């Protein structure tokens, strides 16, 4: 059985110039088609020196299911590589933030976001097909103020899947124990969503 991320691994950690024009143009068309002028969901993606991760990340976001209009905004956070060239080539909506750090970058994106629901994520990640929809399903509940998500590692060639599974299991156990008394500490500021109203 093919994993959901298999096609994105073909371009992950590869320079965009080594990827076929057909793939690049396909992602560009999808990305531009899903950008709404009146989004309900704003996905804010921060990037610092992510030229070899952006294509896979944005491609996976373009393939996400979302039942409402959305926008994807990328914030270039003081990159010194070809991050901005990749964003331009993909036709991404992006902004520059000169103050270095995820807090500054996220705030820049949020300042430009128009959606009622904001999802803050990172550019070095590939997102499963229902990622945005899963956040949204929870955020629309009146009693929910914010959401967060865990992450999993994709093993490199020659790496053991089990080593990563042990690490992730210990991490998840720690978070479950922590969530008993202080669930707000489980967010960790990496990937999270919230409603603006």
Language-model-detected regions and their locations in the chain:
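N-proximal low-complexity "stem/linker" segments adjacent to membrane-targeting elements
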Residues: 1-60
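Short aromatic/hydrophobic "clamp" motif used to bind/position activated sugar donors
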Residues: 118
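Acidic helix N-cap motif at the loop->helix transition within catalytic regions
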Residues: 52-55, 81-88, 130
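Glycine-rich, basic loop-to-helix element that forms the pyrophosphate-binding segment
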Residues: 97-113
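Short, acidic, metal-binding catalytic loop of nucleotide-sugar glycosyltransferases
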Residues: 59-69
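A conserved acidic beta->alpha catalytic loop
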Residues: 60, 76-84
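Short, flexible, basic/aromatic active-site loop/helix in glycosyltransferases
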Residues: 149-155, 164-185, 189
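Conserved donor NDP-sugar-binding/catalytic core segment of glycosyltransferases
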Residues: 130-161
């Amino acid at each position: 059985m093919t994993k959901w991320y298999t096609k994105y691994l073909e371009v992950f950690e590869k320079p965009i110039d080594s990827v076929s024009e057909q793939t690049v143009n396909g992602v560009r068309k999808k990305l531009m088609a899903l950008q709404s002028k009146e989004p309900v969901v704003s996905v804010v993606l921060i990037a610092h020196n992510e030229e070899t991760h952006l294509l896979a990340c944005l491609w996976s976001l373009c393939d996400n299911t979302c039942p409402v209009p959305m926008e994807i905004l990328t914030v270039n956070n003081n990159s010194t590589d070809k991050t901005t060239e990749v964003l331009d080539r993909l036709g991404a909506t992006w902004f520059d933030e000169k103050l270095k750090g995820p807090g500054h970058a996220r705030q820049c994106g949020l300042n430009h976001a128009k959606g009622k629901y904001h999802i803050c994520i990172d550019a070095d990640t590939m997102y499963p097909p229902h990622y945005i929809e899963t956040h949204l399903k929870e955020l629309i509940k009146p009693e929910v103020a914010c959401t967060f998500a865990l992450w999993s590692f994709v093993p490199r060639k020659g790496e053991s899947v089990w080593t990563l599974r042990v690490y992730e299991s210990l991490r998840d156990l720690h978070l479950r124990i922590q969530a008993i008394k202080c669930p707000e500490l489980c967010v960790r500021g990496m990937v999270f969503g919230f409603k603006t109203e």
